[in-house]
Amino acid sequence: MTLINPNIQESNKLKFKDESYLDFNSIKGGDIRHDWSSEEIKEILDLPLMDLLWRAQIVHRSYNPGYKVQLASLLSVKTGGCSEDCAYCPQSVHNETTVQPNPVIEVESVLDRARAAKDAGADRFCMGWAWREIKDGNAFDSMLEMVKGVRELGLEACVTAGMITDSQASRLAEAGLTAYNHNLDTSPEHYSKIISTRTYQDRLETLRRVRMAGITVCCGGIIGMGESVSDRASLLKVLATLDPHPESVPINALVAVEGTPMEDLSSIDPLEMVRMVATARIIMPKSRIRLSAGRQQLGREAQILCLQSGADSIFYGDTLLTTSNPEVEADRKLLADAGITANFS
């Protein structure tokens, strides 16, 4: 099937500086690339906005007819007290914020929250632990019970809990875990300005272990942490050269929290998030692009542009770990006003 009028086929090709082309007609035929360069991706990020939106929408409509959006709910099972020194995070023991360490939520309480999320319309339940890494023992056994319970409710189950061993990944897969989240946060070049307690290679190794266990990969990053556009292109390059691409790519905007080293950083221009989402959609056509933290500060119009140009999931609920999120009713109205259907798996 021809995606657009062949008479304007040449305008449906994006020319890069090295004289190569990205033919948007070929994407529908399964031409998924894993050899993107940072230069190519930056050229896409820098396109005139209307041109970028048009190209992204071609890909988005091709893979997501009807603009269906998955609603995911996120619960912080273990909040605060993390030994990592992530400069953006209010849960780090290195940052003097109002977030205090809390005990791990019990299994039944987590499953109650999962039921409530399902009743509210979510079909993916994500659980977060503020840990550097998973340790074997009672807490991990409880995590396995939570995963099994969430799956028995008919929900997808996602966990984010830091680094992981091969054995732990296998046990989570046996419990039915749908996805494991482990973000790269930023580019390899900018990474040392954000965190020193874990290497970039540590993160990539965690992703490898998740993939080898047969669990789908959820991996994205954060913009607005003082990085350049080239850094954003470099982050996307790392993601888009993974083979296969991550099934889920959360795109976050920094929420500057008082007491963190990034407390004084200004909010990004909402159109920067639109550009990031649109570019991610173009280079990773089959991945689910998740509009994640920082969504509240974007405004309705920018959120709709993100949904139009590539985002096909939002985190749904009043809180994301320790930061605020649009209220459930506001999200329902947003999706209804945009004519978007939720959910799909």
From Swiss-Prot:
Chemical reaction(s) catalysed: (4R,5S)-dethiobiotin + (sulfur carrier)-SH + 2 reduced [2Fe-2S]-[ferredoxin] + 2 S-adenosyl-L-methionine = (sulfur carrier)-H + biotin + 2 5'-deoxyadenosine + 2 L-methionine + 2 oxidized [2Fe-2S]-[ferredoxin]
UniProt entry keywords in alphabetical sequence: 2Fe-2S, 4Fe-4S, Biotin biosynthesis, Iron, Iron-sulfur, Metal-binding, S-adenosyl-L-methionine, Transferase
Gene Ontology BP annotations: biotin biosynthetic process
Keyword Transmembrane included in the entry's annotation: no
MF (Gene Ontology): 2 iron, 2 sulfur cluster binding; 4 iron, 4 sulfur cluster binding; biotin synthase activity; iron ion binding
Required co-factors: [4Fe-4S] cluster; [2Fe-2S] cluster
Residues that coordinate or bind [2Fe-2S] cluster: 126, 158, 218, 290
Coiled coil: none
Pathway: Cofactor biosynthesis; biotin biosynthesis; biotin from 7,8-diaminononanoate: step 2/2
Domain Radical SAM core, chain residue ranges per copy: 67-295
Listed EC numbers: 2.8.1.6
Superkingdom of the organism of origin: Bacteria
Binding of [4Fe-4S] cluster, residues: 82, 86, 89
InterPro entries: Aldolase_TIM (IPR013785), BATS_dom (IPR010722), Biotin_synth/BioAB (IPR002684), Biotin_synthase (IPR024177), Elp3/MiaA/NifB-like_rSAM (IPR006638), rSAM (IPR007197)
Subunit organization: Homodimer.
Family designation: Belongs to the radical SAM superfamily. Biotin synthase family.
Known role: Catalyzes the conversion of dethiobiotin (DTB) to biotin by the insertion of a sulfur atom into dethiobiotin via a radical-based mechanism.
Protein name, entry field: Biotin synthase
Record organism: Prochlorococcus marinus (strain NATL2A)
